[in-house]
Amino acid sequence: MAMKKLLIASLLFSSATVYGAEGFVVKDIHFEGLQRVAVGAALLSMPVRTGDTINDEDISNTIRALFATGNFEDVRVLRDGDTLLVQVKERPTIASITFSGNKSVKDDMLKQNLEASGVRVGESLDRTTIADIEKGLEDFYYSVGKYSASVKAVVTPLPRNRVDLKLVFQEGVSAEIQQINIVGNHAFTTDELISHFQLRDEVPWWNVVGDRKYQKQKLAGDLETLRSYYLDRGYARFNIDSTQVSLTPDKKGIYVTVNITEGDQYKLSGVEVSGNLAGHSAEIEQLTKIEPGELYNGTKVTKMEDDIKKLLGRYGYAYPRVQSMPEINDADKTVKLRVNVDVGNRFYVRKIRFEGNDTSKDAVLRREMRQMEGAWLGSDLVDQGKERLNRLGFFETVDTDTQRVPGSPDQVDVVYKVKERNTGSFNFGIGYGTESGVSFQAGVQQDNWLGTGYAVGINGTKNDYQTYAELSVTNPYFTVDGVSLGGRLFYNDFQADDADLSDYTNKSYGTDVTLGFPINEYNSLRAGLGYVHNSLSNMQPQVAMWRYLYSMGEHPSTSDQDNSFKTDDFTFNYGWTYNKLDRGYFPTDGSRVNLTGKVTIPGSDNEYYKVTLDTATYVPIDDDHKWVVLGRTRWGYGDGLGGKEMPFYENFYAGGSSTVRGFQSNTIGPKAVYFPHQASNYDPDYDYECATQDGAKDLCKSDDAVGGNAMAVASLEFITPTPFISDKYANSVRTSFFWDMGTVWDTNWDSSQYSGYPDYSDPSNIRMSAGIALQWMSPLGPLVFSYAQPFKKYDGDKAEQFQFNIGKTW
């Protein structure tokens, strides 16, 4: 188009001017048609100046130079005596850009592409560029199977040489694959091969991966899958000869034909390693061992190359070259693999830098590093630093970038790029059940106080049955070696009766201090001391509660409604944590095991021990870690020492959002069995089911939960991509389907003594539920929604199908 205008302008010039081949001297230069472009700017873009002697070539260069500015649609150069007359028609200025009909491509993406091509409001309109954009967008639609799509640019003139630019889209419908044919396959059926494709000619309703809508990019991926399928099974000569994609006349159907040559199966005869190995030949040979007669496998060859690169990367060879060349022997159907290795230069780390940590101090991140400045670059150490930063839970994403130092042949800078998340949370929990009604709690937690890495929490609960307050502080790096120090103060006024638990009141307060000791990269130990004062009152005559009081030398009375008891206990607290999760929140890979326990020490009124074991394992089932299987367990056991029982208020409970969803919090397990109350002020509202013997009340059964000294909970969860959520928020929102089970029992319950009542010592009374959960890392903290349906429950259990929590509970 531009060359055509240039030719026309040249012809006009030739017809409008007459001068000799020797040229003429320009005395003056005049412009006609300039509006937006200043005369000075136009003169600066021209190679001709007043006083110059010009000829035909100079005129042609002038026209080219003016067109090259992008400001003009037409240029004419005329001679008027000794004056050079330049007549121009300016390109119109874009006043606005709008889009219509685009559903597959968002406005923001279109604007970015237009700006990258120089098309933006305030710039001049280049019709050639617009035509290229039209074609490029149509090509994009064709690549995703929308062959009837069209994109037209509508230019509406406005006053003062301005225009409105509107891109009108008619996207049409995606062409569906009618049939996929593979020609030349003998070892495997066509159905078997196509079953590994994303594109399908038939998609069952349950297949969430397959797609009948044609996309050029997906077809390329499927062809690579086909190639890998054969190469991984020994077909070293496999080749895709050609691919034909045919479109039906109505442009709504696609036929795909893939012509292949399978060849024969080949076995590996050996691996030969050569090149510059930098003294690591023995380690490299360990990575290249093969089983005799093993089939050639392309994926294993690629993995072997990657393993060699990772090995060399640990020793500072950041950019090794590893090339495998299969030497095929068609006579005996074998492949000898020749691996050439060049380690390249050994690189050293000049600096470690952090980007994106606007809140967290550099020191908080730097102390997690295992790679040292000045040492050679170890890829495994860099990765460990990334893992440790992820496990902090302070960041949504952590990426690493190894940058060569300009002018240095053997130095790099390691850059950790982090995206911080809100580490503070306002905790608010709410639940609703047909029997429980509404329950809620609140608190504030900051895991990265002022960017120092300190965890500070101020938590509190105030409702019908509890007043709770807690202040906790943890310094994860009390010493430079990573020894942590944490402390806690708490007060709790708990009315168990109003919480649908066994009837008693406990006012307690206490403190504890804990030291944490790192053992290695993934293991740590904890040890500390604690003190707690418990003031029990209003204890109703409940069998398990009375059993504990008798073991403590007390003699409670069923005729006294205000039984009270006080204890002061000192405990030795201990723990062990194994943490190999890939990140601190929303993990997708790895395991975590946490063992906690406590035992009373001399000077305590009580004598008991208590142990809890929590495990969680995440197993990704795809390369992108979008589909993940999660298995969780929680085990708990406690008992008395020296003939005493573990206090009933230390019992384990199950049910609720953190254990078995679909059941009301803490209601799974043994229920209270009461002795007949003989006090004159006995509360008639208590709904006990009392057995009688010889006309007198014997024992009374209730639905009040009392917990037990043993607990087992397990959960199997399938984490899936969240529908309608873009990849931008994939790290903030998580959807899962779950199956929960659990039970609580009392090992000290004597079923022979209480015949006719449920055997609360039986651990096989397992409750089960299934449902769906949604988690969101919101600005307020983690939001958890779950809906579960109990499908195995027992008399007295209380269902709570929908549960909603903001933050964690304590």
From Swiss-Prot:
InterPro entries reported for this sequence: Bac_surfAg_D15, BamA/TamA_POTRA, D15-like, OM_assembly_BamA, POTRA
A Pfam family: Omp85
Keyword Membrane: yes
GO biological process, any: Gram-negative-bacterium-type cell outer membrane assembly
Signal peptide: 1-20
Primary site of residence: membrane
Subcellular location(s) per record: Cell outer membrane
Disulfide bonds: none
GO cellular component: Bam protein complex
Alphabetically ordered keywords of this record: Cell outer membrane, Membrane, Repeat, Signal, Transmembrane, Transmembrane beta strand
Residue ranges constituting the POTRA domain according to the UniProt record: 24-91, 92-172, 175-263, 266-344, 347-421
NCBIfam families: OM_YaeT (TIGR03303), PRK11067.1 (NF008287)
Subunit structure: Part of the Bam complex, which is composed of the outer membrane protein BamA, and four lipoproteins BamB, BamC, BamD and BamE.
Physiological role: Part of the outer membrane protein assembly complex, which is involved in assembly and insertion of beta-barrel proteins into the outer membrane. Constitutes, with BamD, the core component of the assembly machinery.
Family, per entry: Belongs to the BamA family.
Protein name per its UniProtKB record: Outer membrane protein assembly factor BamA
The species this protein was found in: Shigella dysenteriae serotype 1 (strain Sd197)
